[in-house]
């Protein structure tokens, strides 16, 4: 779901690839969950990405994981946080998690949210939901 654009301010959309996110076995019950977050600026103004969050839920809406990356953490991973007007950024994440029961892969989804501000400090955000599978 993308919020409405405020005229004269920065706005963003977000996409996750691949969708679904496919768990990659590491060893035993440990998996990597590699995915890219693609952020596009659509309002014609530069924005600064302030936060990327992922809330992972299983059947019944039970939260099974949460990751948050603030601007400092995104920069420490070697990614820029400044997005040019009408530009695009791609962030690659690959969190590693233990999955004690393979049945948890059934009905798992992740809601990804990207928060940003433009040069007038006007906040904008975008979110999308993807599925996760083995």
Please place each PLM-identified region on the residue numbering.
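Terminal connector regions
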Residues: 99-134
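Proline/serine/threonine-rich low-complexity linkers at boundaries of modular beta-sandwich domains
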Residues: 3-13
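Short, solvent-exposed loop/turn segments enriched in Ser/Thr/Gly
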Residues: 17-18, 29-36, 107-110
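Short aromatic-acidic-glycine turn motif
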Residues: 55-69
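Short, hydrophobic/aromatic beta-strand segments
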Residues: 44-53
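Short, solvent-exposed, Trp/other aromatic-anchored flexible loops in extracytoplasmic proteins
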Residues: 71-111
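Asparagine-centered strand-capping/turn motif at beta-strand->loop junctions
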Residues: 39-43
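A structural motif detector for short, solvent-exposed N-terminal "entry" segments of globular domains
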Residues: 12-27
């Amino acid at each position: 779901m993308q919020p409405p654009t405020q005229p004269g301010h920065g706005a963003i959309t977000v996409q996750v690839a691949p969708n679904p996110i496919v768990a990659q076995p590491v060893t035993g019950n440990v998996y990597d969950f590699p995915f890219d977050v693609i952020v596009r600026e659509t309002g014609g103004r530069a924005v600064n990405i302030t936060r990327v969050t992922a809330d992972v839920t299983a059947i019944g809406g039970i939260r099974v994981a949460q990751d948050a990356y603030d601007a400092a953490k995104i920069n420490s991973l070697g990614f820029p946080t400044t997005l040019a007007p009408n530009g695009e950024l791609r962030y690659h994440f690959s969190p590693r998690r233990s999955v004690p029961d393979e049945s948890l892969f059934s009905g798992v989804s992740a809601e990804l949210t990207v928060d940003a501000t433009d040069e007038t400090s006007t906040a904008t955000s975008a979110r999308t939901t993807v599925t996760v599978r083995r």
